[in-house]
Amino acid sequence: MRSSLLLLVFFLSIGWARYCVHNEKSWCQGHNIWGWCFHNKSSGVFNCDDNAFCVSQEQLKNKKSSGCFLRDNSSICCCNDADGCNLGFIGVQPKYAHGQQCTNSMEVPNEDIRQFRPCDDPFCYSVLTAEDDGGPTTVTRGCHSRKMVMHHMSKNEDDKYQNNTKWRETKQIAEMPSCAEILKDQPKVNGTTSMCVDFTYDQEAEDGEEVDEPIKMKGRLCCCAGSNKCNEHAMWADEGISLTEMLEEIEARKVPVDSSAPVNIILSIAFSIFLIHF
């Protein structure tokens, strides 16, 4: 009886997940029952308690909680009370040590700009889209990590129950490199790091709509970090690179660079020749 009960608890628990913000991947997925979201206010790390700091704290065991510990002059924060809850630590003292406030708005052609409450995030973003051959631009601005957590929560729910299609609205940016990858190695200018990536795509038809040819679209994802509302003015004229160039750059980072290797090879060959002849 006991083993059957434990098995039931296991199968029920694997059906749920705790979604957290991740400073490199934008989002991560932990366990809903014993999973924690983590943030280190000194290092700027956000993750799903990858090093098991939170889960190892005796005072947190079997509790829903949110708070910070002082460890080695650093505030280390844990929460498991909501998806993406480690975003809430950005505004905890010291405020904005990592992360900033982002503009949160929607600009649709021929409509009034819709301004929403600013949000806190490790990365701010803007997405610009328009028909490839020209035309008015639609702009969405907001918090990138928060948006990616919401995207994957929605998609997971839709995959299971076919009742939530909100993820389709953010499918394009979810398939792009993360803001951490886009901004890596970019210089700071006046305290802000920023970069835009250009891409193209075919606009999908609405449900039930038939089209002869999909509409060719162009898009631009701009990421920034370092100053409040740094995403407020990102537009087509800003500096940017193509998605192809960005992906090539990301792949190049994975190749270890060892400038001593060619020298070592030459010395090895020379030494071999010396041994043969002498």
Curated annotation (Swiss-Prot):
Recorded coiled-coil stretches: none
Main location: membrane
UniProt keyword annotations, A-Z: Cell membrane, Glycoprotein, Membrane, Signal, Transmembrane, Transmembrane helix
Positions annotated as glycosylated: 40, 73, 163, 190
Topology class, membrane: Single-pass type I membrane protein
Extracellular side stretches: 18-254
Topological domains, Cytoplasmic: 272-278
Disruption of the gene: reported phenotype: RNAi-mediated knockdown results in no visible phenotype. RNAi-mediated knockdown enhances the touch-insensitive phenotype (the inability to respond to more than two of four touches) of mec-6 u247ts mutants at 15 degrees Celsius.
GO process terms (BP): positive regulation of detection of mechanical stimulus involved in sensory perception of touch
Gene Ontology cellular component list: plasma membrane
Subcellular location field: Cell membrane
Domain of life: Eukaryota
Transmembrane segments: 255-271
Disulfide bonds: none
Signal peptide segment: 1-17
Keyword Transferase: no
Keyword Glycoprotein in annotation: yes
Record's function text: Plays a role in mechanosensory transduction (touch sensitivity).
This protein's name: Protein mtd-1
Taxonomic source organism: Caenorhabditis elegans
